[in-house]
Amino acid sequence: MKPLHLKLNNFGPFLKEEIDFSKIDNNELFLISGKTGSGKTMIFDAMTYALFGKASTEQREENDLRSHFADGKQPMSVTFEFQLNHRIYKVHRQGPYIKEGNTTKTNAKFDVFEMVDGKYEIRESKVISGTQFIIELLGVNADQFRQLFILPQGEFKRFLISNSREKQGILRTLFDSEKFEAIREILKEEVKKEKAQIENRYQQIDLLWQEIESFDDDNIKGLLGVATQQIDKLIENIPLLQARSKEILASVNESKETAIKEFEIIEKKTLENNILKDNINQLNKNKIDFVQLKEQQPEIEGIEAKLKLLQDITNLLNYIENREKIETKIANSKKDISKTNNKILNLDCDKRNIDKEKKMLEENGDLIESKISFIDKTRVLFNDINKYQQSYLNIERLRTEGEQLGDELNDLIKGLETVEDSIGNNESDYEKIIELNNTITNINNEINIIKENEKAKAELDKLLGSKQELENQINEETSILKNLEIKLDRYDKTKLDLNDKESFISEIKSAVNIGDQCPICGNEIQDLGHHIDFDSIAKRQNEIKEIEANIHAIKSNIAVHNSEIKFVNEKISNINIKTQSDFSLEVLNKRLLENENALNNQRDLNKFIEQMKEEKDNLTLQIHNKQLRLNKNESELKLCRDLITEFETLSKYNNITNFEVDYKKYVQDVNQHQELSKEIEDKLMQLSQRKLIEQNNLNHYENQLETYNNDLELNEQSIEMEMSRLNLTDDNDIDEIIAWRGEQEELEQKRDTYKKRYHEFEMEIARLESLTKDKELLDSDKLKDEYELKKGKMNTLIDEYSAVHYQCQNNINKTQSIVSHINYLNQELKDQQEIFQLAEIVGGKNNKNLTLENFVLIYYLDQIIAQANLRLATMSDNRYQLIRREAVSHGLSGLEIDVFDLHSNKSRHISSLSGGETFQSSLALALGLSEIVQQQSGGISLESIFIDEGFGTLDQETLETALDTLLNLKSTGRMVGIISHVSELKNRIPLVLEVKSDQYQSSTRFKRN
């Protein structure tokens, strides 16, 4: 991610400010400089806020970012443009605020744009989704962004000096290692659940074992006495338990079957005796009822005689009924014949009236034909009547418009001639403008060279003066140094090494005597007197130390002056006095003014000519358009004339309205005539068809009447023959028999019921006699008592068997469940053993007492330290290396960092480093952290890094090394920005972003040293 442009409104001390990072060439190192409180860090806050809605430091809240001097009606907003993977994006974030005069807060806004084909297209327009889009785009969240892109105040060395728990929190955020802690918790819960399930399964086994029925059997009680924790013993006893239960069930079943057989015997005997008793009673009752039924025999015989006579007279009755129907049909046919004759007469009358109407209509035929001819000839005119009507309406307008267009065209042609006369032979001369611009540029360059040379000469004189002054100081100090060295050489340095040996010599003297052998030199001791003046030796030694101290101080001063002379010489060598023009500044300025005036005059002339050409082109275009409109007008006018001529020729009318009225009237008359003619023809056709239908109906009715008369004659003959057969003389005999027909159904039912019951009694008496023949009836009370006794015994044994069978089956189910639980328990213990071991290892119960998360974080920390040591070795002149403290305890340590001093070959606490050494280590670790996070985050594009940390703790050499390190970052393609107050950085870093404050608001500008 590389910043391109930053725009701030009411943000911190910036009311309205823009920073153009595109002025930074080739990712060069640049310095952000300004007084304390001017708003340097706010630049970092703005970038972080624009992307994530947060400041670059955690301590600053969003409400703290709004300027105190902002207009109450204006929002705080940041617009940030940046480049990522060769694509350009822009984000605009507006903070929430309460607008002056309102009581409710105006919500925050956030828009994300991407440049496509030179234009920004919106990608997101909501705060939450937009921020998530940026996180996914950059591949980092706000915390990771602070570690990768911006190293803010107070957090620069936080990672270096933090303890394991604090580092764990930082590394968790950067490497998303909480998932490993989540795995540990999941495994812990899983183990807890599994152990609970295992314990629950033991309880279920115990509960099932206790619920097994013993049937009060000593063998089963002995088997059930085993403890349920002895699952192997349970498996061994279960088959024995099931076998004994089956034996008990078989014994009960045998007693039950015996009782059932005894009950079935007495039940069968009781049932047979009850059936015999019922049959005897039924037989006696049926015999009595059968005698009573036979008493109805004479009545039934009379009914049968009546029914026979009714059956014989049926044919005669049918003939009589048929005679009545035929007589009715004859009467109806006569009525139909009369009605049909009347209808035919009416139809003949209607036809005569319609014939008269037809004759009257045919008398107007010639007039109608002439109207039809007119309609056919002018139909095409009427269908397009609007076209002809419009021609009459437009012809005058088109004549007037044509005359007006002709006049306007003539005026435009005259105007074009005037413009062409103004242009004449003049042409735009842009080459002359380029030539004058080049001349002006050259003159400006010569003027700048003269000014720069004057400034360089003044700087050179100043540096030469400083150099001469330093050389004079060195000469003076060199002379003093020589005198001190001569004085030092003149001192007697003998016996100086005995100055601190006085006590040692006294001890030796007290331990030896004259004549003894000296323990030092081995010679015989001749004298024990004082041969050495220790006071004189101490005095000479102090004087020598003082001279040596002065010599060392003077040498240090000379070295400092030599370093300063070297620095001055470097500055002198960097001063470049360029070759300049022989002309004076006054002459060059005069020439510059002349050329600028000539340039302005030529620009005015070119502008005038271009305006005239533009006006000429405009007039030419207008003339062309007018000519087109005039041509169009003439074409439309000709078309109108042709249409009017066509209309008047075909219609013989010169008025559209009159033509329309007459045409519509003719069409109406023709349509009415044709409709009336068709209506008359339709009526005649209908009358003809109706008369034909009625004539057919009349013939049909007459034929029917003849048929009915013949049928009536034949039916009368049949009646006479049937009465003769039945010996009936008149209609009274027939009426008496007909009266019986109302009772026929009742008589038939009574006869049939008698015959049916008679047959049923015969059958039932025969059946019951066969069932009771040769059978003896037993005592019912005795049978009932014996039946109840056997039934009670059987039910008791059935209930006992059901209970024992259920308990046996229940025992089998429970033992099967126990076996299933035991098998599952054994398999579960086997399967979960690896999970238990894994949970212990992940939870820190291992040889290093490390949780899985800390193991992963240690791996990442080792990589970070290895990357950091590559730079720290250079910055510390191969003295220091960062190392991870190996001590671990219950997974909460192992992330502390110590420093290894290669000079002493020992490691020590990080707090033992000086301020400058701490800065070196912090910078190296921060850069290493940045690179490792980039690698682990899918190759985040780190094209820039900003450091907000003081460099004041560094000495000259360390500062140079730190700058070299940051310059190396530039060579890897990163833009590097630094906030610092160190004056040396202002001299070393050529590009400075100055932040100035007037106590009200701040402003920025880029400048080069």
Swiss-Prot record:
Any GO MF annotation of the entry: exonuclease activity
Keywords of the record: ATP-binding, Coiled coil, DNA recombination, DNA replication, Endonuclease, Exonuclease, Hydrolase, Nuclease, Nucleotide-binding
Entry-linked CDD domains: ABC_sbcCD
InterPro entries assigned: P-loop_NTPase, Rad50/SbcC_AAA, SbcCD_Nuclease_C
Coiled-coil ranges per UniProt: 176-364, 392-502, 535-802
Residues reported in the UniProt entry to bind ATP: 34-41
One GO biological process term: DNA replication
Record-stated family: Belongs to the SMC family. SbcC subfamily.
Subunit structure: Heterodimer of SbcC and SbcD.
Function: SbcCD cleaves DNA hairpin structures. These structures can inhibit DNA replication and are intermediates in certain DNA recombination reactions. The complex acts as a 3'->5' double strand exonuclease that can open hairpins. It also has a 5' single-strand endonuclease activity.
Entry protein name: Nuclease SbcCD subunit C
Provenance organism: Staphylococcus aureus (strain MSSA476)
Name of encoding gene: sbcC
